[in-house]
């Protein structure tokens, strides 16, 4: 199952930090790609690509102006669309039915104002709680549930550095090509 994330309504002047965190969370939890819509942001995309160069992949970030075209194409190719929204059905009730159905997933996370059409285009409108909170936290919790905790065992290809877990302190290890 391939998982990609569509970030709606990105605004470089206001959303650079939160969209970067959407990208980092998507990557760390096992998505293969984030698709940005809204305004194009080459600086953000270069920053995420730098993380992938250092910490490994595979992962990419691309820009598509037409978010509806992304959704339509995804559905035409047999994938399903999951919109994370506080107005959706509880994740704990919805995720078991979609996690093992074999379909690729496009997870849609909003920006400032989500177009109403997203709610009708989505196969599932899912609430990670029905309270206001961050799209980053929604994405992390949802992906953890969807992939049944698999993010804890992910290995990233071509990583140049990795964390050596410690009870106290911080330790990184540089990875040689021969490792």
Curated annotation (Swiss-Prot):
List the SUPFAM superfamilies: alpha/beta knot
The record's top EC class is transferase
Q: Which reaction does it catalyse?
A: cytidine(56) in tRNA + S-adenosyl-L-methionine = 2'-O-methylcytidine(56) in tRNA + S-adenosyl-L-homocysteine + H(+)
Return the Pfam families for the record. Answer: Trm56
Q: Which CDD domains match?
A: aTrm56-like (cd18083)
Some GO term, biological process aspect, for this entry: which one? tRNA nucleoside ribose methylation
State its location(s). Cytoplasm
The record's annotation in InterPro entries points to: Alpha/beta_knot_MTases, tRNA_m1G_MTases_N, tRNA_mtfrase_aTrm56
Q: What Gene Ontology molecular function terms does this protein carry?
A: tRNA (cytidine(56)-2'-O)-methyltransferase activity
Q: What is its EC number?
A: 2.1.1.206
Q: Where does S-adenosyl-L-methionine bind?
A: 84
Q: Name one GO cellular component term.
A: cytoplasm
Q: Does the keyword Hydrolase apply?
A: no
Q: Which UniProt keywords apply?
A: Cytoplasm, Methyltransferase, S-adenosyl-L-methionine, Transferase, tRNA processing
Q: Which residues form a coiled coil?
A: none
Family of the protein in this entry:
Belongs to the aTrm56 family.
* Oligomer and partners: Homodimer.
PANTHER family given for it? TRNA (CYTIDINE(56)-2'-O)-METHYLTRANSFERASE (PTHR42197:SF1)
Biological role? Specifically catalyzes the AdoMet-dependent 2'-O-ribose methylation of cytidine at position 56 in tRNAs.
Record's protein name: tRNA (cytidine(56)-2'-O)-methyltransferase
